């Protein structure tokens, strides 16, 4: 056969390399599901309104609505504050980053709330009304320790006896102290009771007899501590039996805070010794005593006078005990 004979044409029909092949750009199984439709301005607005109704958070760049309770991983968690006032739900959502109208935590790892100027002003005023100290940097109000004027002088501590008063309290306590006749120490804020000298106002007379002089000298009762004498009979004899009263004892017992009792000085009684008279005359049980054992103004007491004398003593002691125990 001739070499020039017809050959199969190279340009004949062959399987086309450019024939139909699976398109690389054709539909493939989507790993993440159907993509959201790109948003235009109208779509954003519609989606934002839907999101607002569900109280979610709308992302304009992703055209997505995130539930308020479930923030996306890429977004910082924003919890609604409990103390700062919430902004209204009807605020329009814009694609621009939101400026907080409330004090909200900027992230979970940061405790300091972030405030805008309006919020700082509002929170600052609230804090001032509460008497606190406002920190504009972290938008927090720290309660200031409230220093109330004392209504009483209180001890500064359990182990400290000194009282701490302000000037107003010192004036008040000083006035109270003056009214009760005390002496006020402004340094310690304490009132010390001044010894009260109650001078005798009247010299009462008891019944007199021809044998026993019973003129009553003035009362030696002065300050409260003077009322509670160890020997009730000291007062008893001063009350009822001037002429049998030992004037030295009178001076000693009437020495209340320097008070002077002329009756004690003027007594012309014998130096008989009050306690001797007491031992002979007075018995708490009201027992008898021997006739003639006691002389008053040089006279011996008769049985009748003796009985009256004993009864008067007992009645007087009872009255004095009632006074001293009241």
Swiss-Prot record:
One of its GO terms (cellular component) is extracellular region. Used by the larvae to construct a supramolecular structure, the larval tube. It is found in: Secreted. Residues 1-33, 93-102 have a biased composition (Low complexity). It comes from the Eukaryota. Its main location: secreted. Salivary gland. It comes from Chironomus pallidivittatus (Midge). This is Balbiani ring protein 1. Keywords: Repeat, Secreted. The keyword Cell wall biogenesis/degradation does not apply. Residues 1-119 are annotated as: Disordered. Residues 34-51, 107-119 have a biased composition (Basic and acidic residues).
